[in-house]
Amino acid sequence: MVENIQTEADAFGFFGNYGGQYVPETLMPAIQELKQAYQDAKNDPQFQIELDDYLKDYVGRETPLTYAKSYSELLGGAKIYLKREDLNHTGAHKINNALGQALLAKRMGKNKLVAETGAGQHGVASATVAALFDMELVVFMGEEDIKRQSLNVFRMELLGAKVESVTEGQGTLSDAVNKALQYWVSHVDDTHYLLGSALGPDPFPTIVRDFQKIIGQEIKAQVHEKEGQLPDAIVACVGGGSNAIGTFYPFVKDDVKLYGVEAAGDGIDSDKHALAINKGKEGVLHGTKMYLIQDDDGQIQLAHSISAGLDYPGVGPEHSYYHDIGRVKYATASDKQAMDALVRFTKAEGIIPAIESAHALSYVETLAPTMRNDEILVVTVSGRGDKDMETIRNYMKQEGDTHA
């Protein structure tokens, strides 16, 4: 057991030094309303029953824990299990949170949603639940991401969402969050901000974490059923950090090694990366204090990753806290390392992972061979690679791969 870990935000919304509510005064009533509504929902067994029913019959939970026999043999060392979030309806972990927050919005009497999206997966998940519950949805998406993920844009529109292109800044996820927050400020009476990652002002990091912790809860039960023990190590990719915090949270007080993998882009020594923890420092963005990529003057730097879902310049407050206390080790994977792992894994297991998930797999390739073959390593496959086929093909063409 690992003792003395803060597992809930304090009264001011902080995990250690990170978190808080750095928002304009105009938003505070909405934040307080959300916090109260969430507390009420959390204490209402009926809310949880309704959520569980939708997760089971609509999303398709629980997701399998698949033994990666060929990949384990290829790498040598640990026995590798895959947590298959790629098999959720809509193809990623994002639906867990979108569904929970949509039910919460309904409970608050709000029939309109606003969301941000990077890779488009959270946008698709949000559009899906908006269609399911007959709610209006506006999605803000960076211009650059719209180019990279045109198929997901069409999916969102087909589902009835209005997709707004964000041209400010770098035209990526960070800019989309800015616009979504601005929109929420002016439509706060009838609109809920369906934030997609474990960031933003308190209570968002806690809400998103709680709706994603089903990943880790299922892993714990499934490994116990298959192996009669806890896993020895768990690996997940980290952008804003929602799939990773959902994976790690049920294990933070257990004797289990936890590894988050950040996107190193062109490389850890380049200036094109998304290494908020490994190369960033403390700062405030989008309503919360967390690790951020900044220059020497404290200006927030542009994040870069081949994965549209990981190119965010910060990492949520709970991850920032776990890094500081040494509970989670944050490793890195470059674009090349992630893509190489993606190809190896796909050929070994017949599963095409999202590029985000391939960052976690890249670190598995480093970690697994250092472990004994009776040790258990679980990696969260946060999403499937369908949305990334164009990016993968273009990358392989550039690399001169004959399969592209």
From Swiss-Prot:
Alphabetically ordered keywords of this record: Amino-acid biosynthesis, Aromatic amino acid biosynthesis, Lyase, Pyridoxal phosphate, Tryptophan biosynthesis
Catalysed conversion reaction: (1S,2R)-1-C-(indol-3-yl)glycerol 3-phosphate + L-serine = D-glyceraldehyde 3-phosphate + L-tryptophan + H2O
EC number assigned by the record: 4.2.1.20
First-tier enzyme category under EC: lyase
Record text on subunit structure and interactions: Tetramer of two alpha and two beta chains.
Top-level taxon of origin: Bacteria
Family: Belongs to the TrpB family.
Name of protein: Tryptophan synthase beta chain
InterPro entries (alphabetical): Trp_synth_b_CS (IPR006653), Trp_synth_beta (IPR006654), Trp_synth_beta/beta-like (IPR023026), TrpB-like_PALP (IPR001926), TrpB-like_PALP_sf (IPR036052)
Cofactor names: pyridoxal 5'-phosphate
Function text: The beta subunit is responsible for the synthesis of L-tryptophan from indole and L-serine.
One Gene Ontology cellular component: cytoplasm
Keyword Lyase: yes
SUPFAM superfamilies given in the database record: Tryptophan synthase beta subunit-like PLP-dependent enzymes (SSF53686)
Gene: trpB
GO molecular function: tryptophan synthase activity
